[in-house]
UniProtKB/Swiss-Prot annotation:
Belongs to the D-alanine--D-alanine ligase family. Its EC number is 6.3.2.4. Cell wall formation. It comes from the Bacteria. Pathway: Cell wall biogenesis; peptidoglycan biosynthesis. It comes from Streptococcus mutans serotype c (strain ATCC 700610 / UA159). This is D-alanine--D-alanine ligase. It holds the Pfam family Dala_Dala_lig_C. Coiled coil: none annotated.
Amino acid sequence: MSKETLVLLYGGRSAERDVSVLSAESVMRAINYDNFLVKTYFITQAGDFIKTQEFDSQPSETDKLMTNDTIIASQKIKPSDIYEEEAVVFPVLHGPMGEDGSIQGFLEVLKMPYVGTNILSSSVAMDKITTNQVLESATTIPQVAYVALIEGEPLESKLAEVEEKLIYPVFVKPANMGSSVGISKAENRTDLKQAIALALKYDSRVLIEQGVDAREIEVGILGNTDVKTTLPGEIVKDVAFYDYEAKYIDNKITMAIPAEIDPVIVEKMRDYAATAFRTLGCCGLSRCDFFLTEDGKVYLNELNTMPGFTQWSMYPLLWENMGLSYSVLIEELVSLAKEMFDKRESHLV
C-alpha cells in the first residue's frame, strides 16, 4: 500500500514559534509511518520557507526537527513549492500568521487539504474580542465581564471604564495571541497601565477581563458536521496563573484527566463547547477553555483552533482518555481535512 504524504509546517512568525516547534516534534513522533510519508518545512521569523527533513519511518530519539540554529539557508524555497498533489498539510503553527486564517488562506489558494479550521473561523477565534462579541450576540454561553481596548483610544477614559465595570484583579491579554503570551494580572491602576503597554507590544487590540477565582477546565473538540467532545480535563496550577513559562518552560502545572466535576456541569461544558465550535463555523478540531467557580458557575474563556500538540498538551491527552490514541487522532484529523477540502471544492460551482 502506498503511503500518504503529510506536510508538516512549523515555526512561524509569531511569538509562539517555539511552542510550534515543540508541538511539531511531538506530532512527528506520534505519526504512524506505516501509513504516512512526512515532509517538513520550517517557517522562519522573517517568513521564509525552508525545506527541512523527510521521514518515511519512525524517527530515532536523536532526530530533531531543524530550527533557526540548524536550517540550511540554501534549502529556502518559494512558499508555493510545498505543493504536492494528494498531500495533506498539517500546519502545526500557533498564533498570528499561523492560526488566524493567514496560512489557511494560502493553503486554499494552493488547493491543498489542511488540518484544522477554515479561514473565517480561524480569524474570528484567534481574536478574543471578536470571539466574545460573536458568542454574545448568537448564544447564551456565559462569559466573564470584559472591556475591549483598541490602540489609539484615550487611555485615561478606558482606565476609568475598566474601573467602573470591573473589579481588581483583572487580566490583560493581547486579543490576537495564545499560549498565554503577553498576558498580565493587574491588581491596581499602575499594574493595569503596565499590563496594557505589554499587551500592545503583541497586538493593537487588548482584552481586559474580570479576574475570577476559578478552576481552569478544558474540553477537546473533533469533527466537521458531526462534532464530538471529550470529557473535561483540569489544569492544576502551582503558580499564580497559567502563563507561558508555567506551560512550556518550568512545567509548573499538572493535569487531571478527566476532571472531577459534577456530571451535570460536565454535560453543560460539552454542550457549550460544541455550540461555540459550530457558532464560529469551526471544523476539524479545537479546544474550548472554561472557568468553573466554586459555586458551580461556568464561563467560556476561549476557543483555541490549533491547541498545543506537545506530549504534555491537554488536547491529545483528552482524546487519549476517550480511547483515541495520539497516532489515530492524527489519522482522524487528516481524514477530516480531506473531507472539508472536498466539500469546499464542491461549493465552487
